[in-house]
Amino acid sequence: MNMGKIDATVFTEVEKLMAFFKLRGLKPVLLANKRRTITLNGSAPRDLYDYLDEHFPELTIFTRLRDPKIPFKKTKAATEYVLSEMGWESNEVVYIGSSHDDMITALHGSILFLRATWYSNKTDYGFEFSEPKEVARFIDTLCLREHFWSHEIIDGDFEYYALAPFSTSPYKPTFAKYSHNARAAAKFGQGDVDFWLGALVTSMYFTGIHKRIDFIAAYPGHSEGVDNDKMCGDLMTFGKCFNKGYLHDLIERHKTAIKSQTARINKIPIDHHNQLNTIKLNKLPTKNYKTVYKKAPVKKGKTVLLVDDICTAGWSLDAGRKYIEKTGAKTILVTWLKTINTNYCSIGGMGNFDPYEANTFAGIPMDKQYGYHEYHVDGVASEELGDHLELYLDWDWPA
């Protein structure tokens, strides 16, 4: 909540947000430390929380001013207390706030932080929203999905997830209506990048993947270099919400890889060696673009979330997986989409090699194939995603 005079225009939007919560059956909770007052139409100041109780009867307020058993905001105990009282798990909740204290509270509670900048903008943590309507759209179109992954492969330490199938074929209209947008977003920064990264982030959050990782990395593009400029910002923001480092330079493309389209046009045969022989790891990567590690962080006992946009046969992701696993660390692999009717093909034994050096492999065998149809576990996910993309593009306050 803000201090001082309330902006009537903004408060009207907040009222719409509260009405939206009620309409969707969502329970709002306010966690507060400080005493605050409100002055209406020249009347004497009155307790803000009493006013909010009257104005928003569906709102539950937790504050030490009313109950000394409630722990101080910012402490881990504060969110634990609220979650326990409400009967919620942390990844069933989002935290809307704007202050540094809000950020710390969300971080200590392992809760996804939505940064409301319409009152103030005092931290660079969290996903930024400039007005209540943006928050409502995010919740309505991304958080309230019921089908978070269309593809799931879990085989021992091997884990892979995808939001939905990928196809731009006119014969697959259910897939095509979102696949064109996704490809434009992933390859050219067009389409609706915010929707796709929002879908990825919420799927990972609400299925608890963030609880099982230590670091996040994006698989680099085909050109020499590191990182993925379409995803880096949101992946780092997601990681910072839970104190998971984003390692933009963990995987380096030391030599340009041939694109599949270029290979097809020029009739150049390529396989998984096109990826294995063009990447290497950085032993001392950079955390959140600021801090260079002095000791190798990716090692036994750690797990890296490795993210790519569109997966065809899995050669790129699996090359990254094999290099990371050579350090002793584990991986969880996630992509926006999975190409239809194409199996995920894992890479076989690579012998002894240095993952931090450029390598030239030959004759590396393929390992298991994970059938497309067998691991397409939720056919409704694609329909829901397409419908929610359309809703996202045209969203307005419910009538």
What do these predicted regions represent?
Residues L17-I70:
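Substrate-recognition element of Asp-dependent hydrolases with the DxDx(T/V) motif
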Residues A78-D101, K302-D308:
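Conserved Lys-Pro-Asp/Glu-containing loop-to-beta segment of HAD-superfamily phosphomonoesterases
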Residues D140-F215, E224-G225, D229, I258-K300, ...:
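Active-site-facing substrate-recognition patch
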